[in-house]
Amino acid sequence: MVNALKEKYVNEVRPALISKFDYTSLMQAPKLEKIVLNMGVGDAVTNSNNLDEAVSELRLIAGQQPVVTKAKKSIAGFRLREGMSIGSKVTLRGTRMYDFLDKLINVALPRVRDFHGTSTKSFDGRGNYTLGIKEQLIFPEINYDDVNRVRGLDIVIVTTAKTDEEGLELLSQLGMPFAK
């Protein structure tokens, strides 16, 4: 079963990008490569249950098992030693990536309080977009009563776009609600 967002990309977005940026080949048109969800759990140093809860919440949001991230260096000020588990991340590709982006655009972002669109300044210079979510409760899979602590997460949308302008055009054509 083909995702509606993937179908929209193939039938509407890609031809529009080709005509706007004068590409000579279909393969030159920017496309989504992957979406990475990252949840840093700094208080996992003192209580490992917090990390387990973050992993299970990320599993519900993403629909696949996250990997636990570990500290690369020891930092005495944070009581952190190399190799300690301090967060989790998950990489979505293919159908799951399009399903997640569809859910993010149409369900989760409209549930953010005082939402006026996402910032257009969060591109990295190479067409990739980073979005910070302050609370995981905006996702419909998370039950409000089961959450003991509000956590945020980072969402990185990696595209094959060469410039920020191409990346912005790709995401806005896919329906990402950017602030005016």
From Swiss-Prot:
Q: Which UniProt keywords apply?
A: Ribonucleoprotein, Ribosomal protein, RNA-binding, rRNA-binding, tRNA-binding
Against PROSITE patterns, the record matches this protein to:
RIBOSOMAL_L5 (PS00358)
Known partners and oligomeric status: Part of the 50S ribosomal subunit; part of the 5S rRNA/L5/L18/L25 subcomplex. Contacts the 5S rRNA and the P site tRNA. Forms a bridge to the 30S subunit in the 70S ribosome.
* Molecular functions (GO terms): rRNA binding; structural constituent of ribosome; tRNA binding
Would the keyword Ion transport be found if you checked this record's keyword annotation?
Answer: no
One GO biological process term is:
translation
User: Which range is the signal sequence, renumbered to this chain?
Assistant: none
Q: Which domain of life is it from?
A: Bacteria
Q: What taxonomic ancestry is recorded?
A: Bacteria, Bacillati, Bacillota, Bacilli, Lactobacillales
Protein's UniProt name: Large ribosomal subunit protein uL5
- Record function comment: This is one of the proteins that bind and probably mediate the attachment of the 5S RNA into the large ribosomal subunit, where it forms part of the central protuberance. In the 70S ribosome it contacts protein S13 of the 30S subunit (bridge B1b), connecting the 2 subunits; this bridge is implicated in subunit movement. Contacts the P site tRNA; the 5S rRNA and some of its associated proteins might help stabilize positioning of ribosome-bound tRNAs.
User: What SUPFAM superfamilies does this protein's entry cite?
Assistant: RL5-like
In terms of PANTHER family, this protein maps to: 60S RIBOSOMAL PROTEIN L11-RELATED
Looking up InterPro entries in the UniProt record yields: Ribosomal_uL5, Ribosomal_uL5_bac-type, Ribosomal_uL5_C, Ribosomal_uL5_CS, Ribosomal_uL5_dom_sf, Ribosomal_uL5_N
Q: Which Pfam families match?
A: Ribosomal_L5 (PF00281), Ribosomal_L5_C (PF00673)
- GO terms for CC? ribonucleoprotein complex; ribosome
Keyword Cell inner membrane among record annotations: no
Q: Which species is the source of this protein?
A: Oenococcus oeni (strain ATCC BAA-331 / PSU-1)
Q: Which gene encodes it?
A: rplE
In the record, the note on similarity to other proteins reads:
Belongs to the universal ribosomal protein uL5 family.
Which residues lie in coiled coils? none
